[in-house]
């Protein structure tokens, strides 16, 4: 059953309840059964009685992806984060004894196995390191179902609605959240497995045959499917909502997808972005909004986890509605568990407890733009003076510019020489009647104004060529940012004057 939070609950009551859940979780699950956190708390002298509230959570050190990475000295590092209960301790607990007396020893044993035995796994994508596995027990699958049901209910889905799941079939959070969400809500769902399983044509075929009311998937892949469907003259007038995950969703993406859906015969489509990560074993969604309306922010479930916002430099916990890095702590997880996990994601307007303007919900929300702190790259605009380039903003610039369909940013070295300067190259597909010259002018103008750097070259491609460049249907996440630089020396970015003779070329 879905655990409900009253819509009129206030910030104080939410925090008080989370404190009680946290205290119980640390005392009964994390400290006794997590090898990593038991050792950490013992070494640092952190007693379970010291953690009784959300504020007390700060006694625990922050964790990050580097804590999970295997090393030659410790090739089984990730196992230290798996909850590993002591059977004798569990058998002596009052709730276990009562369960055995009321329903028998076998039922009590099954209950404990459902709670603690890992039966399922997802993993990180492994773009910056080796994939990191995260294990789930039946308890975690129930949590995943609840988180998915929250998204479906927030999106206003009805029992008769049909869902087309275009997420790639893989041990990837987004695919399985969509699957378990539909199962828990008893909704019809066809999962295509994305491009690798059925290809773009297969997804278009299912789109026109099933006539889904809700389409879920990666923004880039959904764009390619809808774009090709329009080009082929296909029709689908049933789509009400697009639910997107796995990639950043900027305003320009929303407008493009909404326009494509309208060309297919589905006007006034709502676009919902979700935010989640493997380490949380769940995701959260915005309230539905028409493209052009401001985002409501991501609605959190305060019964399943605590979100803190910290200063990424000082690690100080910040107050509500203050920008900072997102830190997550589960409140009911089993299997793989990471406490106070630094996501590396920066939220521009922080955490709010105010009423959602669309859903009227009072649950906590993450508000504003989310960007990866790792996408602030140090590069050399000149040989002696470096500049921080915010690659997060490139999504907004390129998706918001009129006339650009899809795109790819490529970083490379001049002449492929590791000792040379960096080059920033844009690959574009022109969409609509806007001229190439005007698109180029707008790009250079926007890049200089916002990023203080200009692309070294702009190449225009046909749609099919861009699909190959982005590896649509071949990889888990389409490649919108491609770093082809050797990594043996520090990267530098080739200097551009304010009025360069920029290189452009059309590739057929």
Residue ranges and their predicted role:
Residues 1-123, 129-146, 154, 422-427, ...:
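Nucleotide 5′-phosphate-binding alpha/beta core
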Residues 4-7, 64-272, 280, 284-290, ...:
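Active-site phosphate/ATP/adenylate-binding loop shared across adenylate-forming ligases
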Residues 29, 152, 229, 257-261, ...:
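Hydrophobic, Leu/Ile/Phe/Ala-enriched alpha-helical segments that form helix-helix packing faces
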Residues 129, 233, 314-316, 476:
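Detector for glycine-centered tight turns/loop "hinges" at secondary-structure junctions
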Residues 215, 327, 331-451, 476:
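AMP-binding/adenylate-forming catalytic core of the ANL superfamily
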Residues 249-354:
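Conserved AMP-binding/adenylate-forming
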């Amino acid at each position: 059953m879905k655990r409900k939070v009253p819509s009129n609950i206030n910030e104080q009551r939410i925090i008080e309840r989370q404190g009680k859940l946290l205290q119980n979780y640390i005392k009964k699950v994390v400290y006794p059964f997590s090898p990593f956190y038991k050792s950490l708390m013992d070494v640092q002298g952190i007693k379970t009685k010291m953690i009784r509230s959300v504020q007390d959570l700060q006694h625990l050190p922050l964790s990050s992806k580097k804590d999970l990475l295997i090393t030659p000295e410790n090739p089984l590092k990730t196992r230290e984060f798996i909850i590993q209960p002591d059977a004798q301790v569990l058998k002596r607990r009052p709730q276990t004894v009562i369960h055995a007396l009321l329903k028998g020893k076998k039922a009590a044993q099954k209950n404990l196995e459902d709670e603690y035995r890992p039966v399922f796994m997802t993993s990180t994508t492994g773009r910056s390191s080796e994939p990191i596995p995260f294990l789930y027990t039946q308890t975690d699958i129930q949590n995943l179902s609840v988180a998915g049901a929250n998204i479906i209910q927030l999106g206003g889905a009805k029992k008769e609605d049909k869902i087309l799941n275009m997420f790639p079939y893989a041990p990837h959070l987004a695919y399985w959240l969509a699957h378990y969400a539909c199962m828990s809500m008893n909704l019809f769902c066809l999962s295509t497995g994305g491009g690798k399983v059925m290809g773009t044509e297969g997804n278009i075929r299912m789109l026109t045959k099933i006539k889904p009311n809700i389409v879920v998937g990666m923004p880039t892949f959904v764009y390619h499917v809808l774009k090709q469907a329009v080009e082929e003259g296909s029709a689908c007038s049933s789509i009400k909502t697009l639910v997107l995950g796995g990639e950043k969703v900027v305003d320009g993406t929303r407008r493009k997808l909404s326009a494509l859906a309208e060309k297919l015969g589905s006007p006034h489509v709502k676009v919902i972005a979700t935010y989640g990560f493997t380490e949380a074993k769940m995701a959260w969604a915005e309230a539905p909004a028409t493209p052009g309306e401001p985002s409501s922010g991501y609605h959190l479930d305060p019964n399943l986890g605590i979100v803190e916002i910290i200063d990424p430099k000082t690690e100080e916990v910040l107050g509500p509605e203050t920008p900072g890095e997102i830190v997550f702590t589960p409140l009911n997880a089993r299997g793989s568990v990471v406490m106070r996990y630094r996501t590396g994601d920066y939220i521009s307007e922080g955490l709010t407890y105010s009423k959602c303007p669309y859903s009227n919900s009072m649950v906590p929300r993450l508000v504003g733009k989310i960007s990866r702190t790792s996408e602030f790259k140090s590069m050399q605009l000149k040989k002696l003076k470096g500049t921080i380039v915010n690659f997060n903003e490139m999504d907004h610039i390129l998706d918001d510019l009129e006339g650009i369909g899809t795109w790819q940013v490529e970083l490379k070295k001049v002449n492929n020489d590791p000792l040379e300067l960096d080059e920033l190259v844009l690959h574009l597909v022109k969409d609509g009647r806007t001229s190439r010259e005007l698109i180029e002018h707008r790009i250079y103008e926007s890049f200089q104004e916002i990023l203080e750097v200009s692309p070294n070259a702009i190449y225009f491609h046909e749609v099919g060529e861009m699909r190959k460049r982005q590896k649509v249907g071949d990889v888990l996440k389409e490649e919108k940012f491609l770093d082809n630089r050797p990594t043996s020396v520090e990267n530098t970015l080739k200097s551009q004057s304010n009025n360069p003779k920029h290189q452009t070329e059309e590739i057929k």
